[in-house]
């Protein structure tokens, strides 16, 4: 019984274990399933995103429109990136990195600008004469469209008499040893020669006109063209030139007109249908110009307003324009013919205008004419004129076949020279030609009809001679008249027969070919010319800088008053007013002698003549002084001579108000003959110090016993009422003058008062160093032996803004009269300390003068105003 119970218990336990294990397995399966679902979702999301990227990448790839698989899309993308990397490397290798090339211009823009400046164009021809590239500038020089020349033989545009010589020149690179000997080879593969080229015309039936041109270039092997660009090259050169082009050599040259032109046409337009508006009066004068006009014609609105529109039109178009304007006045609106407009860059641009007349809203009278000008290309103009002549305009067959065979718009005239020779791909990359030149106002260049050369189309081969040419050249405002010019001598007579079908001549096989560098010889020649031009420009810049420096120096001298205004703002000036002079007499002055001051001799007769005119000539010394700080900031001063002179009038027997800047040197009278006035002005360091002792020695010199001093020039001349003292508060210190002989001529005392205006802001004065106190005490003891002058206290100086120096009496005596004057002219800041040598010298002078002086009475008193 017990066994049965235990067995039942064990079986129940086993059942529970099995159920728990099953439940655990189910839970694990659920977890794994959830993980798989999540993983599948993320994988599907990743695949969808990858497919979207592949589809987007495939849509960006050029070529087939059919659906491509993923591997094809990736392969084409890799090929494109590899080709792009190669092209970038080639572009960087051929980039012009010299200093003479502006950094803001690309190679194409720089090349086009240089060609326009040189009156030339690029031409790439095969050795058999087939033209594979021509730059757009050929239109403005020879009136040919690039499409007229490409895939044509160069011999079709050269006189028959010159075919043999040109063919011989183009074939020189095929010779083994004799190829470097001809005279037209400059260096290695570079050559230069001259010939005539046919000028394009609107009417092919017109007589042929040739221009004398110069070819400068070198040969370039087409083996250097990358393999990835061969397909593009096959689309560029046509039909018969495709086989064995790897073994061919082309001649790349810069073709320049032998005779430069003055004004040339601007014939290419990168952005068609460019337009701008203007308003004209009924007399066809400009009243308004649109903001879109300056980038096109170069003129700003204010440059053309008020001028007649006929001033900018080509003389050959005036007759047709006059008819169009007559039609406008009759019908009120209309469209003009194609005409040429002279831009600010002295180039002709083709325009067509739609215009109408606006009427006043009240009286219905004509008010002005509104014009909308549209820029057109020379190709449109030529096609329109040929249609008027009944000539069917058609592109060359080769060009038409080329566009059909290549299957893309790879116009050779818009492909740069580098692409035509190195990449030859399908994508057109227009060179920056007309727009850059049209928007830049460069100087005059040429007129397309200036120097044509008439050459008769004869089957014979006569020797080349001077070829006369006569054609009228229109210039703006009729400033240039018609000119007749003779072309240059072409050279020796032709020695070989004419080869009219040079394009069909076979090229020998197996001949050696030269491997040339990527740098074109034409660009090297252009570089040399630009370097020479750069040196000339630099010389002009240096000369202009030197002239500018001289002008600035003169302006600094002329505009010295600006510095004076700065000093008057930063430092207070001096105001000398109420110069009181007692009754004087100038009739006793009999003789004037030169005055020697500071080592300078001033003739007093010249000063006398100036005083008779009632003026005192003052020469200005400009002093540049920095603001004095409250701390120990040193003063800096600089004297600059000025070309101006200041006239100050003094009237005798009256009061005069003298306002002088800090740098004035007054001219004051001195009647004594042979007198020499030496006026060193001291700078006291404290306003409470004793006054300066002034002595007059036997040699009639004024000397001061102060230490280190600033010497003030005081040139004297006779004046009727005494002397005028002009001190300089900031720099000059005390200024005293004396007249030993003038006192003998007067019977009553004279009073001399000088007003000094104190600064508006009184800076705290620095104390004198301790080592200078014994010297001051010694000086004070010496001054006590003589009649002293009382000095006002510090409180008096601060309360009264002006101080006076009065001399109450001048005693009569011998010429060595001693005069003690005190001038209380305190400074803002600490002044220069007195030197020991000067103080010792002053003491000796005082001791010497003590034996020679007379008694003095009533020392001068300083009284506040």
From Swiss-Prot:
Disulfide bonds: none annotated. Transcriptional activator which forms a core component of the circadian clock. The circadian clock, an internal time-keeping system, regulates various physiological processes through the generation of approximately 24 hour circadian rhythms in gene expression, which are translated into rhythms in metabolism and behavior. It is derived from the Latin roots 'circa' (about) and 'diem' (day) and acts as an important regulator of a wide array of physiological functions including metabolism, sleep, body temperature, blood pressure, endocrine, immune, cardiovascular, and renal function. Residues 447-463, 856-865 have a biased composition (Polar residues). This is Circadian locomoter output cycles protein kaput. Keywords: Activator, Biological rhythms, Cytoplasm, DNA damage, DNA-binding, Isopeptide bond, Nucleus, Phosphoprotein, Repeat, Transcription, Transcription regulation, Transferase, Ubl conjugation. Its main location: cytoplasm. Residues 514-564 are annotated as: Implicated in the circadian rhythmicity. PANTHER family: CIRCADIAN LOCOMOTER OUTPUT CYCLES PROTEIN KAPUT. One of its GO terms (cellular component) is cytosol. It is found in: Cytoplasm; Nucleus; Cytoplasm, Cytosol. Residues 371-864 are annotated as: Interaction with NR3C1. It holds the Pfam family PAS_11. The modification Phosphothreonine is found at residues 451, 461. Residues 107-177, 262-332 form the PAS domain. Component of the circadian clock oscillator which includes the CRY proteins, CLOCK or NPAS2, BMAL1 or BMAL2, CSNK1D and/or CSNK1E, TIMELESS and the PER proteins. Forms a heterodimer with BMAL1. The CLOCK-BMAL1 heterodimer is required for E-box-dependent transactivation, for CLOCK nuclear translocation and degradation, and for phosphorylation of both CLOCK and BMAL1. Interacts with NR3C1 in a ligand-dependent fashion. Interacts with ESR1 and estrogen stimulates this interaction. Interacts with the complex p35/CDK5. Interacts with RELA/p65. Interacts with KAT2B, CREBBP and EP300. There is a cross-link at residues 67, 861 (Glycyl lysine isopeptide (Lys-Gly) (interchain with G-Cter in SUMO1)). The modification Phosphoserine is found at residues 38, 42, 408, 427, 431. One of its GO terms (biological process) is positive regulation of DNA-templated transcription. Residues 450-570 are annotated as: Interaction with SIRT1. It comes from Nannospalax galili. Induction: Exhibits no circadian rhythm expression. Its EC number is 2.3.1.48. A motif (Nuclear localization signal) lies at residues 32-47. Ubiquitinated, leading to its proteasomal degradation. O-glycosylated; contains O-GlcNAc. O-glycosylation by OGT prevents protein degradation by inhibiting ubiquitination. It also stabilizes the CLOCK-BMAL1 heterodimer thereby increasing CLOCK-BMAL1-mediated transcriptional activation of PER1/2/3 and CRY1/2.
């Amino acid at each position: 019984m017990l066994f049965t119970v235990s067995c039942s218990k064990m079986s129940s336990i086993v059942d529970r274990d099995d159920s728990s294990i099953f439940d655990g397995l189910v839970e694990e399966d659920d977890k794994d399933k959830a993980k798989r679902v999540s993983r599948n979702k993320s994988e599907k999301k990743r695949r969808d995103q990858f497919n979207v990227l592949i589809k987007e990448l495939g849509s960006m790839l050029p070529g087939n429109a059919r659906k491509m698989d993923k591997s094809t899309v990736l392969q084409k993308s890799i090929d494109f990136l590899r080709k792009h990397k190669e092209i970038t490397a080639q572009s960087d290798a051929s980039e012009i990195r010299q200093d003479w090339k502006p950094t803001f211009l690309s190679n194409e823009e720089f090349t086009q600008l240089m060609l326009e400046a040189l009156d030339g164009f690029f031409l790439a021809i095969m050795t058999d004469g087939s033209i594979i590239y021509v730059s757009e500038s050929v239109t403005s020089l020879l009136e040919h469209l690039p499409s007229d020349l490409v895939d044509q033989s160069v011999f079709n545009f050269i006189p028959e008499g010159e075919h043999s010589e040109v063919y011989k020149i183009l074939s020189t690179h095929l010779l083994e040893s004799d190829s470097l000997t001809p005279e037209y080879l400059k260096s290695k593969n570079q050559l230069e020669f001259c010939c005539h080229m046919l000028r394009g015309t609107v009417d092919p039936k017109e007589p042929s006109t040739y221009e004398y041109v110069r070819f400068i270039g070198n040969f370039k092997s087409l083996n250097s063209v990358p393999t990835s660009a061969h397909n593009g090259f096959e689309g560029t050169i046509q039909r018969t030139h495709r086989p064995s082009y790897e073994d061919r050599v082309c001649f790349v040259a810069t073709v320049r007109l032998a005779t430069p032109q003055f004004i040339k046409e601007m014939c290419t337009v990168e952005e068609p249908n460019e337009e701008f508006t203007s308003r004209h009066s009924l007399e066809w004068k400009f009243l308004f110009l649109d903001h879109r006009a300056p980038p096109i014609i170069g003129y700003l609105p204010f440059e053309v307003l008020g001028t007649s529109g006929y001033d900018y039109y080509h003389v050959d178009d005036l007759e047709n324009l006059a008819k169009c304007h007559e039609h406008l006045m009759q019908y009120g609106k209309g469209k003009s013919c194609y005409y040429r407009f002279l831009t600010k860059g002295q180039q002709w641009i083709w325009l067509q205008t739609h215009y109408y007349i606006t009427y006043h809203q009240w009286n219905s009278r004509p008010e002005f004419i509104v014009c909308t000008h549209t820029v057109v290309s020379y190709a449109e103009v030529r096609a329109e004129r040929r249609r008027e002549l009944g000539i069917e305009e058609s592109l060359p067959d080769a060009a038409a076949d080329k566009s059909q065979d290549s299957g893309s718009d790879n116009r050779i005239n818009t492909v740069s020279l580098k692409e035509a020779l190195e990449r030859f791909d399908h994508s057109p990359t227009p060179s920056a030609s007309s727009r850059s030149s049209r928007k830049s106002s460069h100087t005059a260049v040429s007129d397309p009809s200036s120097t044509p050369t008439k050459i008769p189309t004869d089957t014979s081969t006569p020797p080349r001679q001077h070829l006369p040419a006569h054609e009228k050249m229109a210039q703006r405002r009729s400033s240039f008249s018609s000119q007749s010019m003779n072309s240059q001598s072409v050279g020796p007579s032709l020695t070989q027969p004419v080869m009219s079908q040079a394009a069909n001549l076979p090229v020998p096989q197996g001949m050696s070919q030269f491997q040339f560098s990527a740098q074109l010889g034409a660009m090297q020649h252009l570089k040399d010319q630009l370097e020479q031009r750069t040196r000339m420009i630099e010389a002009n810049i240096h000369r202009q800088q030197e002239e500018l420096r001289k002008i600035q120096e003169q302006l600094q001298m002329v505009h010295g008053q600006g510095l004076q205004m700065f000093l008057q703002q930063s430092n207070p000036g001096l105001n000398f007013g109420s110069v009181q002079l007692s009754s004087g007499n100038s009739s006793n002055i009999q003789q004037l002698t030169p005055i020697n001051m500071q080592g300078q001799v001033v003739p007093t007769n010249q000063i006398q003549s100036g005083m008779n005119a009632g003026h005192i000539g003052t020469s200005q010394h400009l002093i540049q002084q920095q603001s004095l700080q409250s701390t120990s900031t040193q003063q800096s001063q600089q004297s600059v001579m000025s070309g101006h002179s200041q006239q100050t009038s003094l009237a005798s027997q009256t009061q005069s108000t003298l306002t002088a800047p800090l740098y004035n040197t007054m001219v004051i009278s001195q009647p004594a003959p042979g007198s020499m006035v030496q006026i060193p002005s001291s700078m006291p360091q404290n306003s409470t110090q004793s006054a300066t002792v002034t002595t007059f020695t036997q040699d009639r010199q004024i000397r001061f016993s102060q230490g280190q001093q600033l010497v003030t020039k005081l040139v004297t001349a006779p004046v009727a009422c005494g002397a005028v003292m002009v001190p300089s508060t900031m720099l000059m210190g005390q200024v005293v003058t004396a007249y030993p002989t003038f006192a003998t001529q007067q019977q009553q005392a004279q009073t001399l008062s000088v007003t000094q205006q104190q600064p508006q802001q009184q800076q705290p004065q620095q104390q004198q160093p301790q080592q200078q106190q014994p010297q001051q005490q010694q000086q004070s003891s010496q001054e006590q032996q003589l009649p002293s002058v009382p000095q006002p206290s510090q409180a008096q100086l601060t309360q009264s803004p002006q101080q006076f120096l009065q001399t109450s009496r001048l005693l009569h005596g011998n010429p060595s009269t001693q005069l003690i004057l005190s001038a209380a002219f305190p400074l803002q800041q600490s002044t220069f300390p007195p030197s020991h040598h000067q103080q010792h010298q002053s003491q000796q002078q005082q001791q010497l003068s003590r034996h020679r002086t007379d008694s003095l009475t009533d020392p001068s008193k300083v009284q506040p105003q």
